Amino acid sequence: MTMSPAVDEAAVRSIAIQAATGAGALMRGSFKSTLQVDATDAHDLKLRLDRTCEESIVGVIRERFAAHGILSEEMGYAPGTDPYVWIVDPLDGTVNFFHGIPFFCTCVSCHAVQQNDGSPGEARLPDGRAVGGAVAAVIYAPVARELFVATPRAGSFLNGARLVLKPLASLSDAIVSLSFGARDGSPSYMSRLLPAMIERAQKVRSLGSTALDIVNVAAGRTGAFVQMGTNLWDFSAAAAILREAGGIVDTTEYAPGRWKIIASNPGLFSEVRRLAGQ
């Protein structure tokens, strides 16, 4: 792959933090209030707040990096003229938010854009170009006021404290989180995986926010997370944070834009991957 021209990493990180915490303040101010629902289906919903938070994030990014592309859950993909793309999930855990469960976050990351060379597992944008490494990645959980930040080769941090994972020896010492989707074969897949995890892990949980599930692994709270049926904006920022903390992230695009993800403590990855059928 060709290398993208240099960008001011400190400025990117600062804007990512500003965008994420600004959206988080909007969430915190609206949490447990009357909410306007824009769309629903049998297993999901969209709030007007999703769009409001997205507009806030995009506005912050555009003010400083107008030539960068943006891929966001609500607005879709807007390519830029510079070889960088921001990947945004304005509100990850919308259903939790709607029901008053304080487990949700906003996700913002900036990545180099590169020509697609067909590498296995390579994430691609709608225009066919590849998503490269993260320049900066931020997850903000507004109720807990937890700010996760990662930049390449500089590490991952939670509220300023460095995250460094120590390998765990056994699943029996760890909580494993699973995300139960309703589409793409996820129910049948999880019905096979769940009994194996219940038997081997200390506990199994399903918490409802892909990004927070992944950074919980980075923080050492859980040992692993497995999901089938997720999107690039759900995991891009969190995956960068986990990798910089010393964790392992394995992704498979099994259908266009649909991903299976394994996020793990380094000491548990082989066993989790085996159980997950990789």
Describe the predicted segments one by one.
Residues M1-S14, Q115-A130, Q278:
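Short, low-complexity, intrinsically disordered N-terminal peptides in bacterial proteins
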Residues M1-L91:
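N-terminal subdomain of lithium-sensitive/metallo-dependent phosphomonoesterases centered on the IMPase/IPPase/PAP
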Residues A23, M27, D50, I61, ...:
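Residue-level signal for inorganic ion chemistry
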Residues R51, E55, E74, P90-G93, ...:
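Generic detector of well-ordered alpha-helical packing
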Residues T81-F157:
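DPxDG-like acidic metal-binding loop motif
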Residues V164-Q278:
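An extended, acidic
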Residues A16, A20-A23, A137, S156, ...:
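Small-residue (primarily alanine) positions within well-ordered alpha-helices
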